[in-house]
Amino acid sequence: MSFYDEIEIEDMIFDADQGILTYPCPCGDKFQIALDDLKDGEEVAVCPSCSLMIKVIFDPEDLEQFEES
């Protein structure tokens, strides 16, 4: 699997209402991944508008900060 980039979870923006983390994509849209997917061990965020993917770099304990939001 080929990634556009590897992004630290701290650099992503959390939308508490939707439970997703986003990161700007070069196409103008945003890479997205659900917090629940991260909890399940998924680490690939995809852009819904193009074929690019990023790998989210995180430790499981990093997810706790988003549950407190």
UniProtKB/Swiss-Prot annotation:
Superkingdom classification of source: Eukaryota
GO biological process assignments: protein histidyl modification to diphthamide; tRNA wobble base 5-methoxycarbonylmethyl-2-thiouridinylation
Domain DPH-type MB: 3-59
Keywords of the record: Cytoplasm, Iron, Metal-binding, Nucleus, Oxidoreductase
Functional pathway: Protein modification; peptidyl-diphthamide biosynthesis
Molecular functions (GO terms): ferrous iron binding; iron chaperone activity; oxidoreductase activity
InterPro entries: DPH3/4-like (IPR044248), DPH_MB_dom (IPR007872), DPH_MB_sf (IPR036671)
Keyword Translocase: no
Compartments in which it is found: Cytoplasm; Nucleus
GO terms for cellular component: cytoplasm; nucleus
Primary location: cytoplasm
Record remark on domains: The DPH-type metal-binding (MB) domain can also bind zinc. However, iron is the physiological binding partner as zinc binding impairs the protein electron donor function.
Free-text function comment from the UniProt entry: Required for the first step of diphthamide biosynthesis, a post-translational modification of histidine which occurs in elongation factor 2. DPH1 and DPH2 transfer a 3-amino-3-carboxypropyl (ACP) group from S-adenosyl-L-methionine (SAM) to a histidine residue, the reaction is assisted by a reduction system comprising KTI11/DPH3 and a NADH-dependent reductase, predominantly CBR1. Acts as an electron donor to reduce the Fe-S cluster in DPH1-DPH2 keeping the [4Fe-4S] clusters in the active and reduced state.
Name of the protein: Diphthamide biosynthesis protein 3
Species: Yarrowia lipolytica (strain CLIB 122 / E 150) (Yeast)
Phylogenetic classification of the source organism: Eukaryota, Fungi, Dikarya, Ascomycota, Saccharomycotina
